[in-house]
Curated annotation (Swiss-Prot):
Its main location: cytoplasm. The lineage of its organism: Bacteria, Bacillati, Bacillota, Clostridia, Eubacteriales. The keyword NADP applies. The active site is at D60 (proton acceptor). GO terms for biological process: NAD metabolic process; NADP biosynthetic process. It comes from the Bacteria. SUPFAM superfamilies: NAD kinase/diacylglycerol kinase-like. This is NAD kinase. Keywords: ATP-binding, Cytoplasm, Kinase, NAD, NADP, Nucleotide-binding, Transferase. One of its GO terms (cellular component) is cytoplasm. It is an enzyme of class 2 (transferase). Its cofactor is a divalent metal cation. Involved in the regulation of the intracellular balance of NAD and NADP, and is a key enzyme in the biosynthesis of NADP. Catalyzes specifically the phosphorylation on 2'-hydroxyl of the adenosine moiety of NAD to yield NADP. GO terms for molecular function: ATP binding; metal ion binding; NAD binding; NAD+ kinase activity.
Length: 284
């Protein structure tokens, strides 16, 4: 790999410490000297077509933001290096950087495609299309009443229920908000979409996993109270009553570079379920 870029969150205080260490190790191990550093907030406005690899330095939030802002024709894989708190989406921890770069040079790694969502919504009488890597959530405001939801799958009515909200999730996002609301873990290499209710008061809506090419239409009614559309837990948009939100698979996937010893179930145990100690030493 000749051209490697690094995306950083400019609001984090590591620009002169961890960043310099990462650049030095890349230069020494990968024999790459011209390393571009990018502001993760400006990714959408940059020409990254020459990159062979984009390293995202930060936590899950930084990687989610970069994934949404990348243009659909971006072809290079992403290597997430976790220096945040959780790092479920990251390929490696910062402490494993040197070993990871050596594996990169010996091609002991593989590109995994992660499905993304496209959310179409009417904002101020203008149709907007927004990408999501984890999930699209529609929920009531802080002091609002319950929301009445109508959910259609491929133009067929699936459910009508009243509750606090609902989550439409990718397999990658199944370990995030969807999991907190009672949704299942879904292996991230699959291409399916899950719908999970949030505090379903009527108990008439059950979580469902749909095929990846399904089109989901959501109508949210709240009698004039606040309704919010939230993308990956980072972008919030206040919706009008009776808003229609359409969610489907994005045509382009995110390419994540993972090493061959990557263990999805270990990530779940250690970073989501926090029961790594109970599983230590257990073998088949």
């Amino acid at each position: 790999m000749k051209n490697i870029g690094i995306a950083i969150n400019p609001s984090k205080d590591y620009k002169n410490t961890i960043l310099n260490m990462v650049k030095e190790k890349i230069e020494n191990i990968c024999n790459v000297t011209d390393i571009e550093v990018y502001n993760s907030f400006d990714i959408k406005n940059l020409n990254l077509s020459s990159l062979d690899l984009l390293i995202v330095l930060g936590g899950d939030g930084t990687l989610l933001g970069v994934a949404r802002e990348l243009e659909d024709d971006f072809k290079a894989p992403i290597l997430g290096i976790n220096i945040g708190n959780l790092g479920v989406l990251s390929s490696i921890e910062i402490s494993d950087l040197e070993l990871a770069l050596k594996k990169l040079m010996t091609k002991d790694c593989k590109v995994h495609k992660r499905m993304m969502l496209n959310c179409e919504v009417d904002i101020n009488e203008s149709i907007k299309n927004i990408k999501a890597l984890n999930e699209v959530a529609v929920a009531r405001g802080t002091l609002s009443r319950m929301v009445k939801f109508k959910i259609f799958v491929d133009e067929k009515l699936y459910a009508i229920f009243k509750g606090d909200g609902l989550i439409v999730s990718t397999p990658t996002g199944s370990t995030a908000y969807s999991f907190s609301a009672g949704g299942p873990f879904i292996c991230p290499d699959l291409e399916v979409i899950s719908i999970v209710p949030i505090c379903d008061h009527t108990k008439s809506m059950h979580p469902i996993v749909l095929k990846g090419d399904s089109t989901i239409k959501i109508i949210a009614e709240n009698g004039g109270d606040q309704i919010y559309l939230t993308i990956d837990g980072q972008r919030a948009i206040e919706m009008k009553d009776n808003s229609v939100i359409t969610v489907k698979k994005n045509p382009k996937s995110l390419k994540l570079l993972l090493f061959n010893d990557y263990d999805y179930f270990k990530v779940i145990r250690n970073k989501v379920l926090n029961n790594s100690k109970e599983c230590d030493g257990e073998e088949i």
